[in-house]
């Protein structure tokens, strides 16, 4: 738990610095922030995946909700890593960097995010229809898909200059959102793992 609190505190500090850094040199310190978040996304996804797979293999049983959560964990981790590298794939480091450059990045991020949103909507429908979630019934899948829709709707609002948020800061918020979702799904997998943790009194 301490590891994840440390990661989340690092992400929050990155968001806090993003706005001030982005108005100076868009490929200076912001690039360093993106690469740091990329390393965190890869490490988090790899660690969570290994821990979950080894734990489930020892238990010998995967339920449908387990598979859905694990898939969501991996997708959120991959999305976070992809968004970290997206500016380096789209913006030429030799070109003059402007607000329009980050707008292009947000449009690409939003387009890819729409694919993730429709996947999450289909998963939420399965969870609601079969009532697979152990302790939240139907409300949690609905809240999850709504927050995802709001996050990517905000991306397009910022890209079209309808909301006053710096484009780089919006990108960092989006990366943090996916990392938070991955951590949350990992904790849900651990909580409903079916493994009994013995206390010192046992």
Label every PLM stretch briefly.
Residues 35-39, 62-80, 131-148, 201-202:
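Juxtamembrane helix-loop boundaries in multi-pass membrane proteins
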Residues 193-202:
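Short, highly charged, low-complexity non-transmembrane loops/tails of multi-pass membrane proteins
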Residues 1-18:
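N-terminal secretory/membrane targeting signals
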Residues 168-184:
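Small-residue-rich transmembrane alpha-helices that serve as helix-helix interface/gating elements
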Residues 81-88, 146-163:
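Hydrophobic alpha-helical transmembrane segments in multi-pass integral membrane proteins
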Residues 39-58:
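N-terminal signal-anchor/start-transfer transmembrane helix
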Residues 89-152:
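Membrane-proximal helix-loop-helix units in multi-pass membrane proteins
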Residues 23-44:
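Hydrophobic transmembrane alpha-helical segments in integral membrane proteins
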């Amino acid at each position: 738990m301490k590891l994840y609190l440390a990661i989340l505190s690092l992400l929050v500090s990155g968001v806090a610095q993003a706005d001030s850094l982005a108005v100076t040199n868009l490929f200076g310190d912001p690039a360093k922030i993106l690469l740091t978040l990329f390393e965190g996304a890869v490490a988090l996804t790899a660690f969570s995946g290994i821990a979950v797979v080894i734990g489930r293999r020892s238990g010998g049983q995967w339920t449908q909700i387990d598979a859905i959560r694990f898939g969501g964990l991996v997708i959120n981790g991959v999305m976070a890593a992809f968004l970290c590298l997206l500016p380096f794939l789209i913006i030429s480091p030799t070109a003059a960097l402007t607000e329009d450059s980050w707008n292009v990045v947000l449009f690409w991020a939003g387009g890819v995010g729409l694919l993730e949103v429709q996947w999450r909507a289909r998963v939420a429908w399965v969870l609601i229809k079969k009532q697979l979630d152990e302790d939240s019934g139907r409300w949690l899948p609905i809240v999850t898909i709504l927050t995802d829709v709001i996050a990517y709707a905000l991306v397009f609002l910022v890209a079209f200059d309808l909301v006053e948020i710096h484009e780089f800061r919006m990108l960092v918020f989006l990366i943090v959102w996916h990392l938070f979702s991955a951590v949350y799904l990992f904790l849900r997998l651990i909580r409903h793992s079916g493994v009994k943790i013995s206390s010192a009194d046992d």
